[in-house]
Structures are given as structure tokens and as C-alpha cells.
Amino acid sequence: MGKNNSKLAPEVLEDLVQNTEFSEQELKQWYKGFLKDCPSGILNLEEFQQLYIKFFPYGDASKFAQHAFRTFDKNGDGTIDFREFICALSVTSRGSFEQKLNWAFEMYDLDGDGRITRLEMLEIIEAIYKMVGTVIMMRMNQDGLTPQQRVDKIFKKMDQDKDDQITLEEFKEAAKSDPSIVLLLQCDMQK
């Protein structure tokens, strides 16, 4: 992006103020930082993975970053622009519990069919285990569950109709009624 795009267009800024939890000033700061890190104005998967690697240096964050990238990339074009980035950041950092659950569901629903299968859940849980690294996982995972055991425990609590799939409704209902499920989904057993 050249000098023409170094500032957010007023209509884009207004749209983001209306559709995120950030103020106009915060959006301008985030945009400035985004352009500093991504002069082209877009992030590709490899660049996104490098950001995750910086935050999780003790494990392998590449697989989890791939899933987060897919969830951030709303239009499916293989890149994340500022709008996609800031909207996802708004939900994950300042969104309501309901918004965060919807976002998490999207991440776990790998094929986007509106249902989470055991294999989809296992894929994400394994990616979380790899991302945080063995030493940290041992401290966090005080119950000693393997990824498969964690998936089984989550499905036992969430899959109300026992069809081996979790719908968005089941996901939200279980998370609201039992906060420990959210901890299981995050693989964070510290209370």
C-alpha cells in the first residue's frame, strides 16, 4: 500500500466504529500498526503463522494458526485484510460471551457445515496441545487428559442428542450452562 492508503478512508473508519468494539482512535492506531507489520495491507497464511510462532515459541503454532487464519479470513480469499483482522480481534478481545462462542464454533467447524464432528474437535485440540508445547501443556493440563480423552469429555457434555455431532445450539447451551466446558475447549485447566 502506498501513501494513498496510509490512512483509513472515513467511510471505512465509520463502518468499523459501528461494527467493532474499538473507538475511532483505537482503530487508527491498530491500522497504523497493521500497515507497519503488513505494508501490503494484507496478511497471508505464512505471515500469520509467523505471528503465532512469536507468541508461542515453545511449541508448534503452525497448525493452530492455520485454523485461526481460516476463521479470520471471512471472504475465503486466502488473505486477511485489515477489516477481517480488526473484526476478529474485536470479537476475540472485547466481544460478548455469545460472540466469542460463535467465533470459537466457526473455528472448530472445519468444513463450515454447521456441525462439529469428533474429528474436527480433535484436530483443533491437537493443534492447541502442539501450540503451547509439552512443558506448558503439562502445567495447564492438570487432569492429564490426552487430546482424544478431552474430545470425549467435551462430547459427553455437549452432544445432547448423542449423534456424534455438536450443533451451534448445543455448543452455546453447554458452554453457558457449564463454564468448565469453555476451559476444556481452551485446554486451560487452571481455575
From Swiss-Prot:
Q: Which InterPro entries match?
A: EF-hand-dom_pair, EF_Hand_1_Ca_BS, EF_hand_dom, Recoverin
The entry marks the following residues as binding Ca(2+) 2, namely D109, D111, D113, R115, E120
**SUPFAM superfamilies per the record?**
EF-hand
Which keywords fit this entry according to its UniProt record? Answer: Calcium, Lipoprotein, Metal-binding, Myristate, Repeat
A single Gene Ontology biological process assigned to it is: response to heat
**Span of domain EF-hand:** 24-59, 60-95, 96-131, 146-181
Q: List the SMART domains hit by this protein, alphabetically.
A: EFh (SM00054)
Q: Which GO terms describe its molecular function?
A: calcium channel regulator activity; calcium ion binding; protein domain specific binding
- Segments crossing the lipid bilayer: none
Which of this chain's residues are annotated to bind Ca(2+) 1?
Answer: D73, N75, D77, T79, E84
- Entry-linked Gene3D superfamilies: EF-hand
UniProt: Ca(2+) 3 binding residues: D159, D161, D163, Q165, E170
Tell me one Pfam family matched here: EF-hand_7
Q: Where is the lipid attached (N-myristoyl glycine)?
A: G2
User: Do you know which PANTHER family this protein is assigned to?
Assistant: CALCIUM BINDING PROTEINS, HIPPOCALCIN-LIKE PROTEIN 4
The entry's other comment says: Probably binds two or three calcium ions.
Q: Which family does it belong to?
A: Belongs to the recoverin family.
This molecule's function is given as: May be involved in the calcium-dependent regulation of rhodopsin phosphorylation.
Q: What is this protein called?
A: Hippocalcin-like protein 4
Q: Which species? A: Mus musculus
Q: Which gene encodes it?
A: Hpcal4
